[in-house]
């Protein structure tokens, strides 16, 4: 079974991203998961209670890490996945500190695994600068970031707080199709790369 982690990148109690997150969890993931034999694991960062990153060495240079149980759980959950969806808003043309901090704990868990970015906002700009900023961060850690960011604007005009498309959603059909394609795309590449992992180049050949 292929596992894809869906990660909400905001811990704000009133984050409108929760509406999008719940919509994916309740409406879209069951459709794509059953058809494509994908398990989508929905993750909120507040479940890990991560402190600000405080290790003496960068994780990629520290094979002897000693982590607290909650920190190790985050690492283990990311290691177990075959692909990722990051859902992020835009904060001052970047990403939330809580998301950057969680990523800073990672070393090689996402290396050569596919990642899809969904950016969102309550404006038509759809958090696009947050998505682009996130791309640079996860590329540094070796994630294979899929080229096109899925942008979702006017969230509260289209999605209810409990994760349904509103009856009068101005872009409901458009976002339904777009998000179905997003989950199908990450599922496709996760399956391909899990079944055919990259083989390190042997210079002696």
Protein language model annotation of sequence segments:
Residues 98-105, 141-144:
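Short, electropositive alpha-helical surface patch
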Residues 84-86, 113-116:
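Short, surface-exposed connector motifs at secondary-structure boundaries
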Residues 4, 40, 112-115, 145:
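Hydrophobic/aromatic residues located in beta-strands of well-ordered beta-sheets
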Residues 114-156, 174-177:
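Short, glycine-/small-residue-rich phosphate/pyrophosphate-handling segment
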Residues 154-170:
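Short helix/strand-capping connector loops at secondary-structure junctions
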Residues 1-88, 93-100, 108, 167-180, ...:
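N-terminal beta1-alpha1-beta2 submodule of the flavodoxin-like/Rossmannoid cofactor-binding fold
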Residues 108-111, 140-143, 192:
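Alpha-helix capping at helix-to-loop junctions
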